[in-house]
């Protein structure tokens, strides 16, 4: 039979009438900020954060232009702490998610003071990027009252064209990074809510091998910005509902729980040396 789940806040008084409809009264309780993780709250907040990252992905897919993003779903979305550490991600592309934290941290290092309404673009493989076609958009989330940087949202999408010596920007015989396409180290696309699309177009058109599909690049980057902004909006709503202290506390609990699970997984692997051989299309072994 179909099954649904209903979340009822801890302090809410509930009762059911003769038609089995729930009546709700009272004011929801705000979880306390403390150093002890509550397993129930941990699960609830983990799913709250994950749902925000997933909604970012839905926004990106629906607003993107290219087949690569809209249909192949070659993108990833995640939420980060104010220092660039990964909190939670949607179940997207693992190779993106494993490196995005380094990208966010490099942006923070380049721009010590990120202003509200700013948005940054990068695809630098030496700074957490996968390869040049994977373009990352980083958006800060500031506290509405203090203006303090409290979170960051980020999305990474594979652009089917970013320049280079061959269409598709994945040449197998490139001799340097320039032959693979346009390098974007750290470009401020939006400053205080004002977009610099002209500067982005100029950047994508620079160099001996510029992008062949600048309009598609700009459209998909706009979709990534929209995805990040949806995450910003939902995170602010979460803070308004539970308070910043509680949200930060639950983020810390999630990170500690993840670290503990990883330690337990590593302990479960017996000591020893492990070898694995895989093969290329022509049968050449990779050891």
Which residues are covered by each model-predicted region?
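Gly/Pro-rich active-site capping loops and adjacent beta-alpha segments
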Residues: 1-6, 148-207
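A short, hydrophobic, proline-anchored segment that marks a local hinge/packing element in signaling
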Residues: 136-144, 154
């Amino acid at each position: 039979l179909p099954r649904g789940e209903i979340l009822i806040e801890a302090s809410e008084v509930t009762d059911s009438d003769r038609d089995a409809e729930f009546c709700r009264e009272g004011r929801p309780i705000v979880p306390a900020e403390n150093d002890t993780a509550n397993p129930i709250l941990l699960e609830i907040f983990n799913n709250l954060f994950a749902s925000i990252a997933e909604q970012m992905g839905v926004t990106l897919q629906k607003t993107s232009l290219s087949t690569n993003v809209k249909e192949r779903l070659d993108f990833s979305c995640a939420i980060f702490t104010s220092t660039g550490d990964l909190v939670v991600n949607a179940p997207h592309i693992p190779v993106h998610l494993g490196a995005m934290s380094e990208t966010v941290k490099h942006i923070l290092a380049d721009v010590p003071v990120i202003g509200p309404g700013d948005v940054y673009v990068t695809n630098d493989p030496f700074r957490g990027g996968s390869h040049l076609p994977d373009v990352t958009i980083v958006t800060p989330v500031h506290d509405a009252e203090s203006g303090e940087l409290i979170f960051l949202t980020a999305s990474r999408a594979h652009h089917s064209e970013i320049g280079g010596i061959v269409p598709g920007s994945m040449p197998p015989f490139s001799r340097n990074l320039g032959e693979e396409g346009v390098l974007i180290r750290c470009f401020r696309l939006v400053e205080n809510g004002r977009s610099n699309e002209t500067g982005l177009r100029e950047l994508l058109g620079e160099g001996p091998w510029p992008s062949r599909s600048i309009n598609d690049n700009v459209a998909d980057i706009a979709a990534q910005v929209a995805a990040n902004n949806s995450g910003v909006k939902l995170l602010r709503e979460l803070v308004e509902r539970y308070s910043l202290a509680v949200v930060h506390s639950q983020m810390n609990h999630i990170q500690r729980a993840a670290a503990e699970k990883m330690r337990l997984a590593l302990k479960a692997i017996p000591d020893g040396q492990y070898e694995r051989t895989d093969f290329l299309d022509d049968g050449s072994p990779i050891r």
